[in-house]
């Protein structure tokens, strides 16, 4: 399939650059298994999910991963921490007027904390901080909100660009699992009262989630690598859910990629798994675990649009997106949501 097969026109004013006042106040577009779409409020999810179904959510936490600083010569630089290798060494993106070389010393924060470039790892820099990374990020970092917000991170993002159920010990993402941003505590309690179970996986979202596809034939695209964990407790709940004929509902493309990666690693069966994944899901992929997906509206020609097109199909998705544009749904990370059923 060609990259252009996944293009659509999106008016700039439909990009949601700030969250709504209430998390669960978003709209929801339900795309059913036959390709028909239906307009809802997000809280209607209570009526669209059945007793005994299982929600799978990503419990990662977003780091304040963006640091502004300078070279020893005084030139401005920006560091985005992609992955911590240990307490003081990380893989990073670095923006600078000239590419830093191994041995270059950079300085961040008011006290000029030293960051030494050790070398390269693929398209990333390997750097060593003179102090513990999380401490530096906590003091001087900014939340790495998406580039299409066209603004700096603000105080509202500190709360609203995190899920209400994130695990504070799992602080390693550079982007939020945005489908989960619609869930507030009240909605989660109402889902539990209806006997809709929830469980968690972890996928630490990398900056590659924002990288454009640069190949005309999508099969030639190489996915970025992200670390994920599907614990045995989650795998067991999924097996039980499937055994009684209920649905597994992934909340977000990150949860989807974690679940399907675990299944691929275990011969198509869901089992516990931890590791790096580069899974690329596009039309033709046969899902092993996920029956339904709650997700936001995605960018044209993005791998995430290809993923949702694999669960339904490309024509269904593009038709639903056309309706969403005409109906002025809000798009992207702070936007509205879809509930997508696997096409029959």
UniProtKB/Swiss-Prot annotation:
Reactions that this protein is recorded to catalyse: 7-aminomethyl-7-carbaguanosine(34) in tRNA + S-adenosyl-L-methionine = epoxyqueuosine(34) in tRNA + adenine + L-methionine + 2 H(+)
Chief place of localization: cytoplasm
Pfam families: Queuosine_synth
Gene: queA
Pathway(s) the chain acts in: tRNA modification; tRNA-queuosine biosynthesis
Function, as annotated: Transfers and isomerizes the ribose moiety from AdoMet to the 7-aminomethyl group of 7-deazaguanine (preQ1-tRNA) to give epoxyqueuosine (oQ-tRNA).
Record's protein name: S-adenosylmethionine:tRNA ribosyltransferase-isomerase
HAMAP family for the chain: QueA
Phylogenetic classification of the source organism: Bacteria, Pseudomonadati, Pseudomonadota, Gammaproteobacteria, Moraxellales
Residues in coiled coil: none
Family assignment from sequence similarity: Belongs to the QueA family.
Record has Cytoplasm as a keyword: yes
Subcellular localization: Cytoplasm
